């Protein structure tokens, strides 16, 4: 694939491997991942019955010290396939549990970074507080709930308007931020 997101992910994979880090690269489209959380699966998950494909994702997450998400922002949210992935994978009993009537995150001692591409102007997003809203809801809100306390994100804006040099600079920002976390 020749997308900007894939170029970011490839560079992150490269810098990680150069530092001797094992990388589990999950391209949801390439995997033909089914993002639908069925009622039956939800009921089974609550009984501790986990589908094989989801158990594999759980295993990858448990092995990870650093989780990196690279995705475009669509209508102020995750692309539907990523939303479905998170719905199915960050399940009760794996990502969080209920204890004394309260939710407790189970994915402790993990770091997360997110690189989010947007077609619009980044300054406008910040002016309207969209970056803060994203942080509260999608980024730290969701993943802190699951126990991941160290979550950082970078927004890359105007991706349809910038030239290749600007894209390369953004890719290197992602590489540098990854290098700092390894």
What are these regions (language model features)?
Residues 97-145:
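Short, glycine-/small-residue-rich phosphate/pyrophosphate-handling segment
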Residues 30-34, 93, 104, 140, ...:
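Generic secondary-structure boundary/loop-capping signal
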Residues 24-26, 68, 113-116, 151-154:
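Hydrophobic/aromatic beta-strand patches that form the interior of the parallel beta-sheet core
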Residues 20-22, 109, 147-150:
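A generic structural signal for alpha->beta connector loops
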Residues 1-94, 161-182:
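N-terminal beta1-alpha1-beta2 submodule of the flavodoxin-like/Rossmannoid cofactor-binding fold
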Residues 128-182:
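Glycine-rich phosphate/pyrophosphate-binding loop and the adjoining helix
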């Amino acid at each position: 694939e020749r997308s900007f997101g894939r170029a970011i992910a490839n560079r992150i994979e490269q810098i990680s491997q150069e530092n001797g880090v094992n990388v589990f690269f999950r391209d949801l489209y390439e995997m033909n991942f089914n993002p639908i959380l069925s009622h039956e699966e939800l009921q089974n998950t609550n009984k501790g019955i986990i589908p094989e494909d989801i158990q594999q994702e759980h295993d990858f997450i448990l092995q990870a010290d650093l989780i990196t998400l690279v995705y475009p922002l669509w209508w102020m949210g995750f692309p539907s396939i990523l939303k479905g992935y998170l719905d199915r994978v960050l399940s009760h009993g794996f990502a969080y549990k209920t204890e004394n009537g309260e939710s407790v995150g189970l994915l402790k001692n993990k770091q997360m970074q997110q690189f989010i591409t947007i077609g619009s102007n980044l300054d406008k997003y910040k002016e309207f507080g969209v970056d803060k809203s994203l942080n509260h809801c999608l980024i730290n809100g969701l993943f802190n709930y699951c126990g991941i306390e160290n979550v950082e994100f970078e927004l890359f804006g105007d991706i349809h308007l910038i030239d290749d040099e600007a894209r390369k600079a953004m890719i290197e920002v992602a590489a540098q931020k990854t290098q700092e976390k390894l």
